[in-house]
């Protein structure tokens, strides 16, 4: 009989204890985000400053993240959410929650998982930051020539459309009022001046070659007139020297 009474008392105490534990747990489960609850004091209390609790019923509140150094606040901490950080100007975030800051890539580079990487041949990036390398422009697709080769920082510069002089090719002329009219006029003028200069040089070269050939083939044409002129000049000098003697001789005869 005594043992039975003892067993009943133990069972009653266990039931009472379980009810109390369940009541404590149920009290903490009812706490809202931004609060914490301790088992020995099952009361929902607000998180203190610089702490937060995104889930209610936690025994402690979490410490808010501090954004300093290369970080700045993107979103300030509240009682229910942690602070969000971002990198300062000139840096970019690394990691899913911006755990590290890395300096922005320079023009001619792109950001990869390993950091900043120089653009490969045939690509460029003219942006200062997190831009990606883009392929050079293919000028030949538009029927244009490459005026300036591209670099890792700048794209290819395409020239005016290539003009074909094939009889079967139809040359399209852009009106003067169009965007390419001025460029086409300049190109036409340049080609005309170049052609005229080449023709003039060819003509002068041929002229000198012909004169040189004639002078070598017929040297008397250039030398004979000079000889005749020299001989005539000598005869005139001789005559001018003899004439006074004849006059003197005649004068002497009259005196006798």
From Swiss-Prot:
It comes from Mus musculus (Mouse). InterPro entries: TNFR/NGFR_Cys_rich_reg, TNFR_9, TNFRSF9_N. It comes from the Eukaryota. Residues 209-256 are cytoplasmic. Expressed in activated thymocytes, splenic T cells, CD4(+), and CD8(+) T-cells. Disulfide bonds join 28-37, 31-44, 47-61, 64-77, 67-85, 87-93, 98-105, 101-116, 119-133, 139-158. Induction: Up-regulated after cell treatment by PMA and ionomycin, suggesting that optimal expression requires both protein kinase C activation and increase in intracellular calcium. Receptor for TNFSF9/4-1BBL. Conveys a signal that enhances CD8(+) T-cell survival, cytotoxicity, and mitochondrial activity, thereby promoting immunity against viruses and tumors. It is found in: Cell membrane. Glycans are attached at residues 128, 138. The chain crosses the membrane at residues 188-208. PROSITE patterns: TNFR_NGFR_1. Predominantly homodimeric, but may also exist as a monomer. Associates with p56-LCK. Interacts with TRAF1, TRAF2 and TRAF3. The keyword Glycoprotein applies. Pfam families: TNFR_c6 (PF00020). The keyword Membrane applies. Its main location: membrane. GO terms for biological process: apoptotic process; negative regulation of cell population proliferation; regulation of immature T cell proliferation in thymus. It is a single-pass type I membrane protein. Residues 1-23 form the signal peptide. GO terms for molecular function: signaling receptor activity. This is Tumor necrosis factor receptor superfamily member 9.
């Amino acid at each position: 009989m005594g043992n039975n009474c003892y067993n009943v008392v133990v069972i009653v105490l266990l039931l009472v204890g379980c009810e109390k534990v369940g009541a404590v747990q149920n009290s903490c489960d009812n706490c809202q985000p931004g609060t914490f609850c301790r088992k020995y004091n099952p009361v929902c209390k607000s998180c203190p400053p610089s702490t937060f609790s995104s889930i209610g019923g936690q025994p402690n509140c979490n410490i808010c993240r501090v954004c300093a150094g290369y970080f700045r606040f993107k979103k300030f901490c509240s009682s229910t959410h942690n602070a969000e950080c971002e990198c300062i100007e000139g840096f970019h975030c690394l990691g899913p929650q911006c755990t590290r800051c890395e300096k922005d890539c320079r023009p001619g580079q792109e950001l990869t998982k390993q950091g900043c990487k120089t653009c490969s041949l045939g690509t460029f990036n003219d942006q200062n930051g997190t831009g990606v390398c883009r392929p050079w422009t293919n000028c030949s697709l538009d029927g244009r020539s490459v005026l300036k080769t591209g670099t890792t920082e700048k794209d290819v510069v395409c020239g005016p459309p290539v003009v074909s002089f094939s009889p079967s090719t139809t040359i399209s002329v852009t009106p003067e009022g169009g965007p390419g009219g001025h460029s086409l006029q300049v190109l036409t003028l340049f080609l005309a001046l170049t052609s005229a200069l080449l023709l003039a040089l060819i003509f002068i070269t041929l002229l000198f070659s012909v004169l040189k050939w004639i002078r070598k083939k017929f040297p008397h044409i250039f030398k004979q007139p000079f000889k005749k002129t020299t001989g005539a000049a000598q005869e005139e000098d001789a005559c001018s020297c003899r004439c006074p003697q004849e006059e003197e001789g005649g004068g002497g005869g009259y005196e006798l």
